[in-house]
Structure formats: structure tokens, C-alpha cells
From Swiss-Prot:
Homotrimer. The keyword Iron-sulfur does not apply. Keywords: Hydrolase, Nucleotide metabolism, Nucleotide-binding. This is dCTP deaminase. It comes from Herpetosiphon aurantiacus (strain ATCC 23779 / DSM 785 / 114-95). It catalyses: dCTP + H2O + H(+) = dUTP + NH4(+). It holds the Pfam family DCD. The active site is at E133. The gene is dcd.
Length: 184
């Protein structure tokens, strides 16, 4: 399994729609950077946020998730409460090839502020907008910015095709279009 370079990422995005919209090169200057990098792609977050709140004193249960645990916000910035988290989604829509696995890691700009981006791997054959969880590990409110970078996606090409890909097993998050809550 090898990591893929910018040339491959660009070709797959432009010829096969792997990333839409695709930004060829790094956008910087007054923003948290995003776009194509040497061995990855820095993704942006949309202006749709689900901010965790415990106003209903709910118990978090992934098998029976209560959507009232979140407050929906549509804005250019999102304030994450201290020691809490927010769910958001990417601006980019991904179509992952059958022989590729993607791993997503947070950007150091946010990590240095105590904000941690968590995303599970993008499995072979998966497509959709990526739901991202951003944790505020600090005792202070923290700000994140829509339409700017949040994490970097790394693309790994497998040595052979899997017997069963995500789309073959009708994965529960296949084709997700918005911020998606836990499903069983």
C-alpha cells in the first residue's frame, strides 16, 4: 500500500470526480489553508453545524441516539463550547475508488488551539460528504471557520482490490449529503 502524490490526486479528481469541488493547489493568506498539497488534500467545512448540548440531560447512546442533543447552526463561524464538540460536514463530495483507502488527520493550526478533528477512514467504494467531529479540549469557547481548511486527507492505494468494498455491502453512510448522526 502506497501513499499517493499530488499528481495522482489531481488526475483522479479531474478525470474521475474523486473530489468535487476540487481546488488545484493550496489556498492560503488569511485563511486556514485548504486544497491540494504534496501528498494529500486539505478539506474545508461547510457552514452547517450541529453543536452538542446537554440541555435535555440525555445519555449518549450510539444505538439510540437522541438528535435533541444538538443545536443546529448555519453560520460562517461556529463557537464550540468548552469541553464539548460539534459535528460538521465537508464542502467537498468524495468518490473513493475501489482500490483506495483514505485516512484523515487534523490540521496543526487547530490542534495547536486544543481542537481535535476526528474522522473515520474513507473506505474503498464509499462516496458522500464527510461528517467530521471537532472536539474542543479546552476550558474556553473555541471558534472554527466555515469555508476554510479543517483536516488533511491522505490517499493510500492498495496492492490489490478488496473482495468486498463499502458500496458492495450497502454501507449505512453511503451517499450521505449532510451532517449525519450515528446510525445502526
Amino acid at each position: 500500500m502506497s501513499i499517493k502524490a499530488d499528481r495522482w490526486i489531481k488526475r483522479m479528481a479531474q478525470e474521475h470526480g474523486m473530489i468535487e469541488p476540487f481546488v488545484d493547489g493550496q489556498v492560503r493568506g488569511g485563511v486556514v489553508s485548504y486544497g491540494l498539497s504534496s501528498y494529500g488534500y486539505d478539506i474545508r467545512i461547510a457552514d452547517e453545524f450541529k453543536i452538542f448540548t446537554n440541555v435535555n440531560s440525555a445519555i449518549i447512546d450510539p444505538k439510540n441516539f437522541d438528535p435533541r442533543s444538538f443545536v443546529d447552526v448555519k453560520a460562517d463561524v461556529c463557537i464550540i463550547p468548552p469541553n464539548s464538540f460539534v459535528l460538521c460536514r465537508t464542502i467537498e463530495y468524495f468518490r473513493i475508488p475501489r482500490n483506495v483507502l483514505c485516512v484523515c488527520v487534523g490540521k496543526s493550526t487547530y490542534a495547536r488551539c486544543g481542537l481535535i478533528a476526528n474522522v473515520t477512514p474513507f473506505e474503498p467504494g464509499w462516496e458522500g460528504y464527510v461528517t467530521i467531529e471537532i472536539s474542543n479540549t479546552t476550558p474556553l469557547p473555541a471558534k472554527i471557520y466555515a469555508n476554510e481548511g479543517i483536516a488533511q486527507v491522505l490517499f493510500f492505494e492498495g496492492d490489490e482490490l478488496p473482495d468486498v468494498a463499502y458500496d458492495d455491502r450497502s454501507g449505512k453512510y453511503q451517499g450521505q449529503t449532510g451532517v449525519t448522526l450515528p446510525r445502526i
